[in-house]
């Protein structure tokens, strides 16, 4: 395996979600079609898929996006309309994680982890 490449969130309104994620992550999509929107976030792909019917948002699989300032990133997501899922919490050493729900109910994880370095 080569490592994680893409995290996909299903949304009911692709246009509004594209606008929201553009503001939330500070990047514009590199691929924008009615069937898929893709963002390059620090070399990893965040994808948006339009919901094709009933979708259940579960908490059993999480992706955490790396940040340098967990509280600032958390506050920014909340100010853009995300809702609290788990407040920033120290999980050992200097590692801090938090999760929010986007306006479509998807769980977004953020992590400050100075011990993990990209290759």
PLM regions and their residue ranges:
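Conserved short beta-strand elements that form part of the metal-binding/catalytic scaffold
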Residues: 28-61, 107-113
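Short glycine/proline-centered loop/turn elements that form peptide/ligand docking sites
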Residues: 16, 33-37, 90, 117-118
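Vicinal oxygen chelate
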Residues: 74, 80-119
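Mid-chain, well-packed structural core segment of small domains
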Residues: 63-81
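Short beta-strand micro-motifs in enzyme catalytic cores
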Residues: 37, 61-63, 94-98
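Short secondary-structure junctions
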Residues: 26-31, 84-88
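Conserved active-site tyrosine of GNAT-family acetyltransferases
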Residues: 17-22, 77, 105
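N-terminal beta-strand motif that seeds the catalytic metal site of vicinal oxygen chelate
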Residues: 1-18, 45, 61-63, 114-119
